Amino acid sequence: PDYSSAASDVYKRQSKDLTKDEERLALPIMGRVQSFDNPWDVYAMSTYNTITSLSESRIDENILYAGTDDGIIQHTKDGGQNWTKITVDKLPETPSSAFVNDIKADLHNTETAYVLLDNHKFGDYKPYIFKTTNGGKKWVSITNGIPDGTLVWRIVQDHVNPNLLFLGTEYGVYISLNQGDNWHKFSNGLPTIPVRDLAIQKRENDLVLATFGRSFYVLDDYSPLRDMTEENLSKEGVIFEPRKALQYNQVSGDNSSNGGQTYYASNPQYGANITYYVKNAPESMKTKRKKLERAKKDADIPFPGWDALDKENAEQKNQVILVVKNKAGEIVSKISGPLKKGVSRVNWNLTSSIPTTVKASSRSSRGWRGSGGGITTQVDPGKYDLFLKKRVNGVVSDLAGPVELEVEKIRSGTLSNPMADKHDQYYADLAEFSKVVSSYQHMFEKANARVRTYQRMLMQITTNIPEASSSLYELTETMNMLERKVGGSKAKAEVGEKDFLTISDRLSNARGGWYPNSYGPTQLHMESFDIAKEMFKRIKPEMDAYFENVEKTGKILEEAGAAILLD
């Protein structure tokens, strides 16, 4: 090989030819050397007798390993002045024709290296993986857990934990937690496809895969795998140390005018992606039944019965609850996740919610939209504690924690916030007022629905009730009047003509600075809040009187024998 120490401007020879340097056309094909006049297709083949893999030690630049396509491993400890050669047939149960797919110097130990071999061109599909721990003097096979018939293409080692290895194979990715002594399939979510190359993005701890299907895959933040120790795996639950969560304002939309040839994947979810482990999780009734059915294989599978199936359908799902607390011990957020055996992930979007009201129905009257559902604010940068709990059959118990999470703003705002000391109290007051407004919204919608229903009920009564008829007329007039005061003119809305700002509009403006910004509240926010409170103060007595009259009319209809109203 050649090397350059001048930013690739000049290369210098670092060794003699490290291959067998054979004449390809003089080698036997199909049992004998062929005539030159026989058809050849060397255009479709790579050059033979070449170095196919080269690795420099991260610890000592003088240590290099080279592997060739004609079955040779070479290594040097003096920067290429002297090379030690070993043919692959000297490795345990390895044919001399094996191709060196990959060779890697260990990132943590100068005496350790790994090599992957491939002999499929000769009809041999065995996995050949070897490791040396004495500088290439002896190589041992490390294929425990790799099925026979699985070609191996690429190996990479974690730059932090020397025991953590990743292996790209013909049928996906494998992982070792003990430096190759055992391998485990690690391809959940991947298609069955040859993984021809692997790389680690060290800053983000991401594993990048390149496949023979012309695709790339990225495993975001695999760092929890470093802590997959026997001690941790023996615990009931573990929260793996999360990486620092970066706080910023997201840009909406992934792309605009890139056409149909855009080649990209979704970014990781914004916020903190938190990985946790659960040792044991209760199986659902359906899972238990299916497991028993699979065990019967070709035998008859009995019908479980309708009662059992109904119980399966009605069974409530168990879950984990990730609790986020600030350093004062106050709960900032709670996130639910799946309760299942093994490793799972949940996402926290770095916000805290101030609850206001929640509606079972999503329908809203004009002018009230957006006044319920809670207020969401960005959390302050700093350190938080994570706790993992499980909820099984309604009972909540602890699993793990606390584990610290740091939240950091990507950059400070250009403007200092003169109202920073009033920020929290302002939005707390806004949330309390929103609760009241949302409650009246719900009562108003419910009262309006009753009035419309009373109109139908009145037509079903056989007796004449003038009092109810006139009362319903007045109620309908009041309802229409209040809807105009709350939501504005229907006629203007039909044609898009501007109208007065409603309570909802004012509240929306008052909320305008809370998310995704941490600036404010501004003078405009506070003035909008004050106007909303004044508008509500004026209309509240009229609402109360309307609700009272709706109740009175309902009693009149009930006494007259009308149908029972089911709210």
Identify what each model region corresponds to.
Residues S15-M45, V88-E93, I146, K235, ...:
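Surface-exposed loop and turn segments in beta-propeller and other repeat-based domains
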Residues I72-H75, N82, Y128-K131, K138, ...:
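A short loop-to-beta-strand structural motif that recurs across blades of beta-propeller domains
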Residues S96, I331-D380, G401:
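Glycine-centered tight-turn motifs at strand-turn-strand junctions
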Residues F387, V403-L405, V436-D567:
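Mature extracytoplasmic or organellar-lumen-exposed domains after removal of signal/transit peptides
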Residues P1-Y11:
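Single conserved hydrophobic/aromatic residue that forms the stacking wall/gate
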Residues E22-S35, K90-N101, T143-V156, H184-E204:
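Conserved blade-ending motifs and adjacent loop-strand segments that build the rim/top face
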Residues S252-Q319, R345, H423, Y427, ...:
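Contiguous beta-strand segments within globular domains
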Residues E23-S53, T110-T112, Y248-Y263, P302-W306, ...:
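Surface-exposed acidic, glycine/proline-enriched linker/cap segments
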